[in-house]
Amino acid sequence: MAQRSGKITLYEGKHFTGRKLEVFGDCDNFQDQGFMNRVNSIRVESGAWVCFDHPDFRGQQFILEHGDYPEFFRWNGHNDHMGSCRPVGMHGEHFRIDIFEGCNFTGQCLEFVEDCPFLQSRGWAKSCVNAIKVYGDGAWVLYEEPNYRGRMYVLERGDYRCFSDWGAHSARVQSLRRVLNFF
């Protein structure tokens, strides 16, 4: 059974000031909770969370793990817009992900059980990943750039036959890491 709980507190002002919204589970639209879509600081008290810049779990994703984020550039270098969030499902602490060169699990395949800051350093010949299988207990974050930079995508256990299955507009993936969940 997946662990899908935790607590995240969103603040309108920097450094945990202004109006706040406490969230304990899926929240598909902050405005429905009487909270504007401007978030300038966040405190993750437990769990790992994926936040989206639009309501209904759409748009750019941001992974937030246990800790304080006093200003929005700590999780997003572009703006303070955020519309929805949900806890990341965690099953335990055994991590495994297989990446594939082609859609539908074809072509070159490489397995990871640890973080990888640059896929090409592990023998991955391209900057693209077209399909993924996430096994084991934990979730993973994919990044479009090396060293855990650029647009990110959170993947939980399951099969992703094409990059659009994880919400990407392109197959560009150059680094990946495990989501570590602290309660």
UniProtKB/Swiss-Prot annotation:
The keyword Cell membrane does not apply. The keyword Repeat applies. Primordially eye-specific. Present in lens nucleus. In the retina, expression in observed in the outer plexiform layer (containing photoreceptors axons and synapses) and photoreceptor outer segments (at protein level). Also detected in the auditory hindbrain where it is highly expressed in the medial nucleus of the trapezoid body, but also present in other nuclei of the superior olivary complex. PROSITE patterns: CRYSTALLIN_BETA_GAMMA (PS50915). It holds the Pfam family Crystall. SUPFAM superfamilies: gamma-Crystallin-like. Residues 6-46, 47-89, 95-136, 138-180 form the Beta/gamma crystallin 'Greek key' domain. Keywords: Eye lens protein, Repeat. One of its GO terms (biological process) is eye development. GO terms for molecular function: structural constituent of eye lens. It comes from the Eukaryota. Has a two-domain beta-structure, folded into four very similar Greek key motifs. Belongs to the beta/gamma-crystallin family. Crystallins are the dominant structural components of the vertebrate eye lens. Also plays an important role for integrity and function of auditory nuclei. PANTHER family: BETA/GAMMA CRYSTALLIN (PTHR11818), GAMMA-CRYSTALLIN N (PTHR11818:SF22). Monomer. This is Gamma-crystallin N. It comes from Mus musculus.
